[in-house]
C-alpha cells in the first residue's frame, strides 16, 4: 500500500476508512461521522471518503458506503437523487452577448427557482400551472408513486407535477459555462425536490422507530437502518429508486426549458445542443457488484466513476468545474467526488464574509451578488484544484469549465 493515493483511518471497532484527502482538510466532525459509520456491522469491506468530504446531516457528505443486509436512509438523506446534468452546445464564446444579464433573465423566467410562501400556493419556486409536457412526464411517474402512497399515505406531497422542472434552493444552480476551447455549455444541479424530501424524512424516522422498537444501540441515532428481508427495507428501496427517477426527470425538463429559452431569447444565433451530454446522480443508492459480491452502494455526495463513466465535478460560484471520465478504481468502489465540498458551515460563511467579499470572488460571473447567497460564496468551499489533485487516480479531466452565468435559488 506504499503507492496508495489515499489515507487509511483504522477505527478501534469496525472496518477501515479509505480517505482520498491528501492535500485537503478533513474536519474532526466529518472524521467522527466516518468512524461511526465504520462501526456498523453490515458495512462491506470499508468506507470510502472522497476529497470533498465534510460533515453532513445524517451522514458524511462525500462518502461511499457499501452495505450487505441493510440500508441507512439518513446516509442517502432527504435530497434523494440529487445530481448534475451538463450539455455542450454548438455555440462558442464569441457568440454570447457582451452583457449576459439577458441570458440569466431568460433562464430565470424559464425555470422556477428558490422557495417562498413556506412552499405554499404562492411559492415562486413551483409552477402555478405545470406546462403540458411536464404533465406528460408526470403521467409516466405517477403509477409507481400511487403504488407507494397506497402503502404509505403520509408520503403524499402537494407539489408533485408542479415541482418537476424546478431548481430549488441551497447549493442547487444553473450555469452557462465556457470550456477550454471557448465552447458554451449549460450545466445544472438539482434533485427530487419536495417529493423526495418527504420520502427521505419519512423513512429516516421509520428506521429510527424500528431501532427503538428493537432496542438497538447505535453510535449515532442518525445511522438507524432498515434490515434487508423486511418490508420496510424493500419499500424504502422502491421509494428511493422512484425518487431518483423523479430527480432525473426534473433535471431533464429544466435543461429542455433552458435550451428553448436561450434559443428564443434573440441574444444568440441558432444552435444545437446535442454535441455532448453528461448526466449523473451523486446522492443515491444502487445495487452494484464489487469484489465479486452484489452490494448496495450508497453514494452521499459522490459520483460513480467506473472505467469510462462520464461525470461532472462542479466547483463553487466563481471556480472551475470539470467534466471527467472515470478510471474504475476498485478501492473507491469506482467513485469520485461530487464537487469541491464545503470548507465551513453556511452559518459560519455568513458570519465571516461580506457582500463585498462575495462580489470580488464572483467577478466576471453574471450572478446574484446579494447577502442571501453569501453562504454559497466561493470562499465557503474547499479548493477545487486541491480536490482534483487528490483524486487523480479516480478520474481524468476531459473538459475544464468556467461559468459566466450562474442562477441560484
Regions found by a protein language model. Give the residues of each.
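Domain-length cofactor-binding catalytic modules of enzymes
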Residues: 2-33, 42-47, 57-61, 71-73, ...
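Short loop segments at secondary-structure junctions
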Residues: 68-69, 90-92, 327
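Active-site cofactor/substrate anionic-group-binding motifs, chiefly glycine-
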Residues: 55-85
Amino acid at each position: 500500500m506504499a503507492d496508495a493515493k489515499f489515507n487509511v483511518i483504522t477505527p478501534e471497532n469496525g472496518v477501515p476508512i479509505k480517505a482520498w484527502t491528501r492535500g485537503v482538510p478533513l474536519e474532526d466532525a466529518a472524521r467522527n461521522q466516518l468512524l461511526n459509520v465504520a462501526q456498523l456491522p453490515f458495512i462491506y469491506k470499508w468506507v470510502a471518503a472522497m476529497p470533498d468530504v465534510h460533515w453532513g446531516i445524517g451522514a458524511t457528505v462525500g462518502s461511499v458506503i457499501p452495505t450487505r443486509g441493510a440500508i441507512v436512509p439518513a446516509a442517502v438523506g432527504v435530497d434523494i437523487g440529487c445530481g448534475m446534468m451538463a450539455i455542450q452546445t454548438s455555440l462558442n464564446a464569441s457568440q454570447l452577448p457582451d452583457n449576459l444579464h439577458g441570458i440569466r433573465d431568460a433562464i430565470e423566467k424559464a425555470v422556477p427557482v428558490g422557495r417562498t410562501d413556506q412552499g405554499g400556493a404562492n411559492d415562486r419556486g413551483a409552477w402555478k400551472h405545470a406546462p403540458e409536457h411536464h404533465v406528460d412526464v408526470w403521467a409516466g411517474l405517477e403509477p409507481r408513486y400511487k403504488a407507494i402512497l397506497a402503502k404509505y399515505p403520509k408520503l403524499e406531497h402537494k407539489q408533485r407535477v408542479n415541482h418537476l422542472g424546478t431548481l430549488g434552493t441551497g447549493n442547487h444552480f444553473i450555469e452557462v459555462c465556457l470550456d477550454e476551447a471557448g465552447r458554451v455549455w449549460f450545466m445544472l444541479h438539482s434533485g427530487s425536490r419536495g417529493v423526495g424530501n418527504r420520502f427521505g424524512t419519512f423513512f429516516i424516522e421509520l428506521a429510527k422507530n424500528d431501532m427503538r422498537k428493537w432496542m438497538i444501540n447505535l453510535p449515532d441515532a442518525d445511522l438507524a437502518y432498515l434490515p434487508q428481508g423486511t418490508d420496510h427495507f424493500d419499500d424504502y428501496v422502491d421509494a428511493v429508486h422512484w425518487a431518483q427517477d423523479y430527480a432525473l426527470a426534473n433535471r431533464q425538463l429544466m435543461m429542455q426549458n433552458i435550451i428553448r429559452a436561450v434559443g428564443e431569447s434573440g441574444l444568440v444565433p441558432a444552435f444545437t445542443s446535442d454535441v455532448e451530454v453528461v448526466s449523473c446522480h451523486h446522492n443515491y443508492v444502487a445495487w452494484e457488484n464489487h469484489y465479486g459480491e452484489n452490494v448496495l452502494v450508497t453514494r452521499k455526495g459522490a459520483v460513480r466513476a467506473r472505467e469510462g463513466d462520464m461525470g461532472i465535478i462542479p466547483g463553487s460560484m466563481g471556480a472551475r468545474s470539470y467534466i471527467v471520465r472515470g478510471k474504475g478504481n476498485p478501492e473507491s468502489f469506482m467513485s469520485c467526488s461530487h464537487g469541491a465540498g464545503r470548507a465551513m458551515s453556511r452559518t459560519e460563511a455568513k458570519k465571516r464574509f461580506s457582500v463585498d467579499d462575495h462580489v470580488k470572488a464572483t467577478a466576471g460571473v453574471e450572478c446574484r451578488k446579494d447577502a442571501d447567497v453569501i453562504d454559497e460564496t466561493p470562499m465557503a468551499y474547499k479548493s477545487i484544484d486541491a480536490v482534483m489533485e487528490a483524486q487523480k487516480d479516480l478520474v481524468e479531466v476531459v473538459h475544464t469549465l468556467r461559468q459566466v452565468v450562474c442562477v441560484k435559488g
